[in-house]
Amino acid sequence: MFFAGPSVALTSPRAPPEPPPTLLAVAGSHRCAASGELTGGSFSQGVVLAAGVRGVVVDKELIDQLVEVAQRVVASGAISANGHGNVSLRVPGAHEMYFTAGPSLRNHAPSAVVRLGLDGTLLEGDLPPIQGAVVAMHTAMYEDHPDVGCVLHTHSPYATAYAVAHRPIGCWVEALAMFGLPTGVPVAEYGPRGSEQAVGNIRAATIPGVPAVLLANHGVLVFHRTPELAIQVGSIVEEAAQAGINAGSIGGPVEIPEELRVAAFQRAMVFESRGTAHA
């Protein structure tokens, strides 16, 4: 269960039912076939190519939604200059995901979407080994958090600076308290990309109810109920990191007192409950 936060003025996706749904991911410029046969065998770290999969029906609505999510991530600005990162979405009613398998979230297309089971099995599309290596941290978040509907990973510059310094982001920006990160953003210890050690470190660092974690020497991972909330939290984390670094030149950032973080969150909920005011 995540801390609730003020709603966003975007269309919410279908709520993921039980059992945990499938994931969607955009794959940069790689092909995603709508039919055909895939042969068995090992594919990459944590990913196994399904044997004999024919004519898999791909959910076009979810693929289009995932492409839009990737576009929104890029538009948010909370991303590195080269656009490196990946996004995934649960697929309602299936223990699977669609995943962005390309090297960049920029200039992607529906044909770049791949489909995987939450056990890491590749069901549809082409998944390069370097992207396949990060699948495990996406599936881990879905397995550990049944209410998560979207996982977002980027190398946004300021948040990554904290990750490289192995320093958590403190709750010195009010928006962190308002959107479910009153503890700030923790740091997961480094582990080689896609390894069991890396995934284990992420799980160990995750704070219950807090939908983000920094990945030491790597980047940032955000996981939330909806894509809209994941994008919003990703942007807030990057803004807080930038503010912290800028404040370092004038004495350093000052965290909000713990009791006032709770008050800031509760106040946000009061205004949320009132809805939009009209003159």
Model-inferred region functions:
Residues 17-21:
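Compositionally biased, intrinsically disordered low-complexity segments enriched in Pro/Arg/Gln/His
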Residues 15-16, 40:
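Positively charged N-terminal leader segments that act as targeting/secretion signals
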Residues 2-3, 43:
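Aromatic (phenylalanine/tyrosine) cluster motif
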Residues 10, 23-24, 38, 49:
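Leucine-biased recognition of intrinsically disordered, low-complexity hydrophobic segments
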Residues 35, 39-41:
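N-terminal amphipathic/hydrophobic targeting modules at extreme N-termini
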Residues 50-279:
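Glycine-rich flexible loops
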